[in-house]
């Protein structure tokens, strides 16, 4: 972009004319830019010569100075143009202002010497005056020239030849080579530092991208694993709910058949079967021998044990029923003690349990009434018996029998005479008096 001289044209032109005019005291004018723009403004003027001008130059700016000096040889006025670029100016600004030098030279016309300066050593007044003296073209002064007539006889003309000093020449050349090499080394060092910095920056950028990619892959993998776990838990929960809602008789796997296959796989020489024989009521035989005119026995009131407070597990959802074993329950639940010794021995042999440690029915001291199912509203006569309940358990959930080999019960019902025939299935009496199998995880044993 070109330099703008029209914005402050009047001030610029006035200072320039004052320097050209020998009648004015102003012998130098200094120009610079307005901020970072290309508009030229008048920075300062003065009448103190080069010494005063040098003090006004700033190391952080690009400036143009026009100064009037006297030729040391002829005493005539000479004009010097100084293109000043401070050491603190940025490289981009230097490149932009380099194109303005020719424009400023056309504006500040009449300069005998032009100096491009960057440091204070380039604008020392002595060095500038030496350049002005060399530019005059003659080493004489018109005002100091003496008349030839007054001169005395001239002596022989002496030679101006000077012998070359080899050492000084070597030192001068060596110094120049040294500084040139130093500048070259410094330039190479800066270039190497830039390459190293760029390489380190690229390496850090690659590591950052690789780390971010690994972290993203890890997060994605954890998310997929978590999603799979959630889906598996949801499917398992749905299967559990579906199995709980389907009755035992309608399930795809029949637990009785599974247990039957398991029981068949056992060796035949195992313990005595836990299946009891058919029960026969001795009370019927006894009543058949008695005459019809015998008075009916007095009714006996049943004394029921108050139910214990129910014990519920942490979750009220009934667990799945385990595989039941195949078993045949007895046909009757009444065991009467006979007064006859022979009959008593016979009944004890019939009701002996298949297992050695547990009896299905133990001896009782009184008889129970077998006429409880009479449809008429007549009083029910029962034979007073003493029943031993054996191992008891309280129902935690309700269970409906799938067939006649199982028993049904409601929560808090008491189940007595329990036999542990399998790990998942037990056998006992329900409150209704039925004997059969039931799932072990539906009840809680009572101490």
Swiss-Prot record:
Keyword Transport on entry: yes
Keywords: Actin-binding, Cell junction, Cell membrane, Cell projection, Coiled coil, Cytoplasm, Cytoplasmic vesicle, Cytoskeleton, Endosome, Golgi apparatus, Membrane, SH3 domain, Synapse, Transport
Regions of compositional bias (Basic and acidic residues) in chain numbering: 184-242
Disulfide bond positions: none
Subcellular location: Cytoplasm, Cytoskeleton; Cell projection, Lamellipodium; Cell projection, Ruffle; Cytoplasm, Cell cortex
ADF-H domain sequence ranges: 2-133
Principal subcellular localisation of the protein: cytoplasm
UniProt region (Disordered), positions on chain: 141-160, 184-368
GO process terms (BP): neuron projection morphogenesis; positive regulation of axon extension; positive regulation of dendritic spine morphogenesis; postsynaptic actin cytoskeleton organization; regulation of actin filament polymerization
Gene Ontology, cellular component aspect: actin filament; anchoring junction; clathrin-coated vesicle membrane; cortical actin cytoskeleton; cytosol; dendrite; early endosome; Golgi membrane
Domain SH3: 388-447
Regions of compositional bias (Acidic residues) in chain numbering: 345-365
PROSITE patterns: ADF_H, SH3
Keyword Transport recorded: yes
TM segment ranges: none
InterPro entries (alphabetical): ADF-H (IPR002108), ADF-H/Gelsolin-like_dom_sf (IPR029006), Drebrin-like_SH3 (IPR035717), SH3-like_dom_sf (IPR036028), SH3_domain (IPR001452)
Signal peptide: none
Topology within the bilayer: Peripheral membrane protein
PANTHER family xref list: CORTACTIN AND DREBRIN, DREBRIN-LIKE PROTEIN
Function: Adapter protein that binds F-actin and dynamin, and thereby plays a role in receptor-mediated endocytosis. Plays a role in the reorganization of the actin cytoskeleton, formation of cell projections, such as neurites, in neuron morphogenesis and synapse formation. Does not bind G-actin and promote actin polymerization by itself, but excerts its functions by interaction with other proteins. Required for the formation of organized podosome rosettes.
Family: Belongs to the ABP1 family.
Protein name according to UniProt: Drebrin-like protein A
Gene that encodes it: dbnl-a
